[in-house]
């Protein structure tokens, strides 16, 4: 375990099991329907890469880069779109893939934007969910694990762009982010 972590919430094995189970459900839900998977950069990259390997249907991928943190541990509520999709999603089945759903402010903004583009359907898959933090009226259809309200890093999740490369997810020690 990394020295800056207080504990490990999800091991590599836990994460792979979540991807396998979620991938099977998504495969069943979208069988015989092409799917556009939209990863939210940067955090979702590792989860998306592992999840889409487990989805057995025709799919394409695209990415959006959106920020509401601006370097801290709390969402500012102000959503900035840094990179938009590269292709049209009109009349397509779209699955947003996110690393973590907390306040929901960011995902609510993204879903409203994508729905305005006349998609056929739009759902959310998230590895982690913190329902106690929810401020926006939004839920993910596919949830890997509900977790307590602690600041987590690893497997794509960061604190000031660090810890994304950890192959597991852990809780960051308070003294690390309170400096």
Swiss-Prot record:
It catalyses: IMP + diphosphate = hypoxanthine + 5-phospho-alpha-D-ribose 1-diphosphate; GMP + diphosphate = guanine + 5-phospho-alpha-D-ribose 1-diphosphate. One of its GO terms (cellular component) is cytosol. The keyword Hydrolase does not apply. It is an enzyme of class 2 (transferase). Pathway: Purine metabolism; IMP biosynthesis via salvage pathway; IMP from hypoxanthine: step 1/1; Purine metabolism; GMP biosynthesis via salvage pathway; GMP from guanine: step 1/1. One of its GO terms (molecular function) is hypoxanthine phosphoribosyltransferase activity. Its cofactor is Mg(2+). Diphosphate binds at residues 42-43, 164. SUPFAM superfamilies: PRTase-like. It is found in: Cytoplasm. GMP binds at residues 130, 151-152, 158. The active site is at residue 102. Keywords: Cytoplasm, Glycosyltransferase, Magnesium, Metal-binding, Nucleotide-binding, Purine salvage, Transferase. Mg(2+) binds at residues 98-99. Purine salvage pathway enzyme that catalyzes the transfer of the ribosyl-5-phosphate group from 5-phospho-alpha-D-ribose 1-diphosphate (PRPP) to the N9 position of the 6-oxopurines hypoxanthine and guanine to form the corresponding ribonucleotides IMP (inosine 5'-monophosphate) and GMP (guanosine 5'-monophosphate), with the release of PPi. Belongs to the purine/pyrimidine phosphoribosyltransferase family. PANTHER family: HYPOXANTHINE PHOSPHORIBOSYLTRANSFERASE, HYPOXANTHINE-GUANINE PHOSPHORIBOSYLTRANSFERASE. This is Hypoxanthine-guanine phosphoribosyltransferase. It comes from Staphylococcus epidermidis (strain ATCC 35984 / DSM 28319 / BCRC 17069 / CCUG 31568 / BM 3577 / RP62A). The gene is hpt.
């Amino acid at each position: 375990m990394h020295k800056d972590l207080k504990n490990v919430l999800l091991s590599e094995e836990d994460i792979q099991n979540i991807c396998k189970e979620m991938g099977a459900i998504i495969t069943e839900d979208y069988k015989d329907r092409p799917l556009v998977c939209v990863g939210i950069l940067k955090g979702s990259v590792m989860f998306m890469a592992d999840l889409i390997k487990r989805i057995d249907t025709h799919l394409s991928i695209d990415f959006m880069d959106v920020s509401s943190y601006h370097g801290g541990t709390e969402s500012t509520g102000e959503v900035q779109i840094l990179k938009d999709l590269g292709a049209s999603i009109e009349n397509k089945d779209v699955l947003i893939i996110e690393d973590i759903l907390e306040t929901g402010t960011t995902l609510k903004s993204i879903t409203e934007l994508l729905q305005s583009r006349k998609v056929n359907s739009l759902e959310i898959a998230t590895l982690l969910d913190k329902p106690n933090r929810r401020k926006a009226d939004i839920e993910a259809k596919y949830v890997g694990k509900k977790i307590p309200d602690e600041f987590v890093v690893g497997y794509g999740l960061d604190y000031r762009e660090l810890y994304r490369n950890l192959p597991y997810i852990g809780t960051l020690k308070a003294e690390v982010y309170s400096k």
